[in-house]
């Protein structure tokens, strides 16, 4: 575990029990506008899918089955697991205005709308056609996705994290903090204040005495 991952655990957002997940990251400014404090939104029914059965990930090549872009293929750029949503890059878009003011109508920009997991299918790398998949184990014991039509393994893509690092391919450099150094306990709690610890470490002797203070 890297130091950035340890710091991310400390800044984890605590969500209320009736929180409704959306396209924005929980705790962000856009999310707070959708879920203002003190309000209760109607609960959304979501099909329960076990974590071990979920098979769509960021970077996957999928084909859309429904909607205006049915038959088109694209790359998954976002997965909202709590709503069974996936977002396909450049497809299933709608247009909206941003930066609207009194004197300016705003700039029209495209925005990808989410799709349910059953509205897309993974693309088989053998023939570039949509296919059903199932989880199987290889001879080495690795759990992989396999096309039910061709039997071809569909590997999981390596997707960078928010800080741009791909954990599977990252190699620590000379300026990176190792896991052992990050987890090493170097602080020993004491009853002295910080100032007293610094004075003791640097050999500073306090010879001054408090003078009388008069208030008028």
Swiss-Prot record:
Got a GO cellular component term for this one? mitochondrial inner membrane
**What's a Pfam family in this record?**
ribosomal_L24
Quaternary structure?
Component of the mitochondrial ribosome large subunit (39S) which comprises a 16S rRNA and about 50 distinct proteins.
InterPro entries in the record, alphabetically?
KOW (IPR005824), Rib_uL2_dom2 (IPR014722), Ribosomal_uL24 (IPR003256), Ribosomal_uL24_CS (IPR005825), Ribosomal_uL24_KOW (IPR041988), Translation_prot_SH3-like_sf (IPR008991)
Query: MF terms per GO, please?
Result: RNA binding; structural constituent of ribosome
Q: What is this protein called?
A: Large ribosomal subunit protein uL24m
Q: Which UniProt keywords apply?
A: Mitochondrion, Phosphoprotein, Ribonucleoprotein, Ribosomal protein, Transit peptide
PANTHER family the record matches: MITOCHONDRIAL RIBOSOMAL PROTEIN L24
Gene encoding it? MRPL24
Q: Where is the signal peptide?
A: none
On whether Thylakoid is a keyword of this UniProt record, the answer is no
The family database entries (SUPFAM superfamilies) matched by this protein are listed as: Translation proteins SH3-like domain (SSF50104)
Indicate the segments forming the KOW domain, all copies. Answer: 56-89
Task: PTM Phosphoserine: list the residues.
Answer: 24
PROSITE patterns for the chain: RIBOSOMAL_L24
Q: Which GO terms describe its biological process?
A: translation
What is the species of this protein? Answer: Bos taurus
Family of this protein: Belongs to the universal ribosomal protein uL24 family.
Q: Where in the cell is it found?
A: Mitochondrion
Q: Where is the transit peptide?
A: 1-9
């Amino acid at each position: 575990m890297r130091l950035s991952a340890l710091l991310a655990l400390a800044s984890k957002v605590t969500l209320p029990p009736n929180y409704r997940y959306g396209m924005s990251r929980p705790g962000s400014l856009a999310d707070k506008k959708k879920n203002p404090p003190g309000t209760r939104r109607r609960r959304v029914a979501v099909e329960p899918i076990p974590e071990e059965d979920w098979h769509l990930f960021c970077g996957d090549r999928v084909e859309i089955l429904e909607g205006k872009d049915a038959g088109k293929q694209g790359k998954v750029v976002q997965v909202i697991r709590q709503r069974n949503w996936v977002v396909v890059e450049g497809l299933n878009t709608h247009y909206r205005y941003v930066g609207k003011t009194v004197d300016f109508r705003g700039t029209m920009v495209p925005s990808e709308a989410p799709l349910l997991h059953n509205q897309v299918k993974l693309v088989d790398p053998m023939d570039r056609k949509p296919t059903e998949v199932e989880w199987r184990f290889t001879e080495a014991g690795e759990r992989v996705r396999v096309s039910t039509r061709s039997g071809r393994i569909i590997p999981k893509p390596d997707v960078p994290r928010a800080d741009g690092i791909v954990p599977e391919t990252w190699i620590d450099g000379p300026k990176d903090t190792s896991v052992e150094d990050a987890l090493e306990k170097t602080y020993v709690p004491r009853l002295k204040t910080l100032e007293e610890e610094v004075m003791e470490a640097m050999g500073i002797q306090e010879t001054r005495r408090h003078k009388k203070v008069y208030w008028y």
